[in-house]
Amino acid sequence: MISPHPTMSLPSFKRFDVRKLIAQGIEPLPEIRKRVDALKPDEGLAIVSPFLPSPLIEKLRGEDFETRVEPQPDGSWVTYFWRAAPAG
């Protein structure tokens, strides 16, 4: 488990690297969906991808997930997703 930022008081993050799946021509969305659906309230998902997953970001934001994106020196991207805290 990893954290997107040392000062962020966020859940622990499960890492899922989709680069090999994509390189093999496999659509990673079904596996991402399984992992997102299995998240506990105190967990988040960190996805490592070869490109910025803009459609996924928009989709999960529409499901009340917060997002943080970090470009990596090797050209890959780490995108963190976690459930937004309930209002109030």
Residue ranges and their predicted role:
Residues I2-L39:
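An N-terminal amphipathic alpha-helical segment
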Residues P11-F13, D42-A46, S76-V78:
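Intrinsic-disorder/low-complexity, polar/charged segments enriched in Ser/Thr/Lys/Arg/Asp/Glu/Gln
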Residues I22, E58, Q72:
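Hydrophobic small-molecule pocket/channel-lining residues, especially in calycin-type beta-barrels
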Residues R33-V36, P55, V69:
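General detector of folded, globular domains
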Residues L39, G44, P86-A87:
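An acidic-aromatic pocket/loop used at catalytic or ligand-binding sites
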Residues E43-E66:
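Short, structured protein-protein interaction patches enriched in aromatics and acidic/basic residues
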Residues D64-G88:
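C-terminal edge-of-domain segments
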